[in-house]
């Protein structure tokens, strides 16, 4: 069982058995407020220094497919590598549709991921290598706003930690693919800095499962 599946199963059990119910967007959910988890590099114990491209190819081959998780192989690969497909995205800040890749690499014309790398190249011990996705001038007027709000890259002992904050996260439908996307991002940044990616420091305000997914999610923990 890979790290993404083990974390997914653990958190699904906690959320489904918590009996903490809420109604979100007119849909019942079960949720946990204030979740903090460490999601390790899936190759942490490997003698090989696997880079982001090798990780993506493993995703594409199905090495990280998870039973009962609806997104697999090619679809996972496309999502994970969306950071490298920015030229295929319409770069229009006034459009309704956004992607994390767009907000991170074209936030009002600014490439925040490039800024992170340059900041850490100047000072590897910096706590200032931060990128945001929320745009108050646009998102306060929209129903659909980014779930992932902030990332921070920290280098400690020649290893990169990616600290992330989600305002809201669909545990059953999105958590594994989100973690693979962020692992790819962490590996990509680490590769540019010539350090090893260590882990994701995950923070989420509302981690939840929608009522429509209860039945399928329950199969995961049976």
Which positions does each model-derived feature cover?
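Terminal, non-catalytic protein-protein interaction segments that mediate quaternary/complex assembly
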Residues: 1-222
């Amino acid at each position: 069982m890979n790290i993404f599946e083990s974390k997914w199963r653990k958190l699904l059990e906690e959320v489904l058995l918590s009996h903490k119910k809420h109604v979100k967007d007119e849909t019942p959910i079960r949720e946990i407020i204030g979740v903090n988890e460490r999601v390790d590099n899936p190759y942490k114990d490997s003698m090989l220094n696997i880079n982001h491209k090798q990780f993506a190819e493993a995703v594409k081959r199905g090495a990280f497919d998870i039973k009962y998780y609806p997104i697999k192989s090619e679809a996972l690969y496309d999502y994970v590598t969306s950071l490298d497909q920015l030229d295929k995205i319409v770069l229009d800040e006034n459009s309704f549709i956004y992607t994390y890749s767009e907000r991170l690499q074209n936030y009002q014309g600014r490439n925040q991921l490039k800024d992170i790398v340059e900041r850490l190249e100047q000072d590897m011990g910096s706590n200032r290598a931060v990128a945001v996705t929320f745009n108050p001038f646009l998102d306060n007027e929209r129903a659909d706003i980014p779930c992932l709000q902030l990332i921070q890259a920290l280098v400690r002992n020649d290893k990169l930690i990616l600290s992330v904050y989600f305002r809201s996260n669909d545990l059953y439908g999105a958590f594994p693919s989100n973690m693979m996307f962020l692992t790819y991002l962490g590996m990509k940044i680490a590769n540019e800095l010539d350090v090893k990616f260590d882990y994701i420091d995950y923070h989420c305000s509302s981690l939840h499962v929608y009522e429509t997914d209860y039945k399928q999610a329950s199969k995961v923990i049976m």
